[in-house]
Amino acid sequence: MKNPSLHRYATRPGLYFTDDGGADAVVRSETADQVWFCVLEPLDQPSAFYADAARLFNEPGLTFIDQAKKQRICTRRIPSLNLRETLFRMDGPNYGLWYVHVPQAWDGMQYGYRVNGPWDPNHGVSFNPYKLLLDPYAKGIEGKMELDPGAFAYECEIKNGKVAGSPFGPMSTVDSLGHMPVSVAIDDRDINKHMGEPSHPHVPWSKTVIYELHVKGFTANAPWLPPELRGTYACLLYTSDAADEEDS
């Protein structure tokens, strides 16, 4: 069997802005049946995807997830939260990755994922499409977790500040939106975006190197440090012109 060719953006998980004004979203799941990339917008503002998405309406006996399964791109209104959620059905899995190109994306865009699949907690599988999931590769997060039944994948109640319910019980069909944080897209392609803000270097992750070292071994013979500070944690607080020259 011939393996399918990789898409241009199906190389590593994350959200990547593209030159056409959109973004490529990639997430990993080898066991999901379906994955949606979900964009959240204020309800009182025009949607960026008005011309692309099918509208979902409240229909008796038909949930928004059931409707979303039939559409490539769909949107729903959530008046109680003043939000509009647009769901993009992702392609996959391709080598364990799901991917989609979003036609429009912007710095500060709120988003998340919904994933459909088996509900079998006894075997470690707890897919629940009614729960918005954070992007594990998100560069920003906004909001907070609430102690609310909607925040849990299984049916439960909150009694006296404690959760009453079993994680091995029935799947919850309460939407988690409004009870959990959401992912935030950060456009860090412009390395000069935050020039003049010395409180944070704002180095793009694509140009960042994380270097792990042992303080004692790294500084024991450092010529730019006073002898009494070499090999100690105190040297981490030391600054001088010599140290700046060494760093450069």
Give names to the regions the model predicted.
Residues 2-240:
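N-terminal structural segment of carbohydrate-active enzymes
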Residues 238-248:
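Single conserved hydrophobic/aromatic residue that forms the stacking wall/gate
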